[in-house]
């Protein structure tokens, strides 16, 4: 994973400590990723100490502080700048103690409604800075493990991958000698709002055996939402949009879809012989390109839309649509 660009971490001493911490974190992340990659069934039982490790918390703080959302405060009213003014080292020491003795409790997420095209609105959750730092530390620990499991078709919110890479992959499938002729596009229904907590936690447990880390992840999922009307709502499904952990957890949940499609007849896991037989029989072969909750499949037959839509995982029109490549 790439290092950070130089940032203002709060003084020369803290800046030096950050670079030392970053080196330690990157080394541990590399080990976690290798262990997960080399053993697809390995469960990690001692991750909690990494989450509250001073190096991980410091790197997590720098990520939160350098993010454009550092100006935004959660329900406690404190922005990252306000915390920085009161002293970063003391803040991180107190936070580490709270996480380590398990007295830390996430606060409700402050909800804001962001306008979307067509007059609709999208929910955005703003966590407290304290919660963001713990989430960022959790992500530093969990991401290299789950990255070992994610398939190449997934591009959204992954290190070293971006939207342009997904577009390039789609173009690659459309070019010779592949010449896929159809694109079926669809959005995952209410992806961030409707993900089942129990199903998601089952997926996380497949890799994480540390009950303290599992409890921490679940606590963030259940933290509740404080709406713009100041009414506190329970959060029984989904991951709050805007949360640092949400993109990773959404990819963990949606990796089930990636694996299902990869193993389906005519999918990426099919042999060349199987794909040739399907072509002779008039059945489609296909590839999947997923960017977060947006899916695009390249197909060689109009039957593709009839196959993929009834799975219930994709919205129909206007969320899903078929396009003939080269058509006006």
List where the protein language model places each region.
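Non-catalytic, polymerase-adjacent accessory regions of viral genome-replication enzymes
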Residues: 1-89
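Long amphipathic N-terminal alpha/beta scaffold segment
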Residues: 79, 83-86, 91-113
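Short beta-strand-to-loop capping motifs
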Residues: 83, 128, 297-301
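Conserved polymerase palm-domain catalytic core
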Residues: 99, 108, 117, 149-313, ...
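N-terminal core-binding DNA-recognition domain of tyrosine site-specific recombinases/integrases
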Residues: 122-125, 181
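Nucleotide/phosphate-binding loop and acidic/charged catalytic motifs
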Residues: 138
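Glycine-rich phosphate-binding segment of PLP-dependent enzymes
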Residues: 142-150
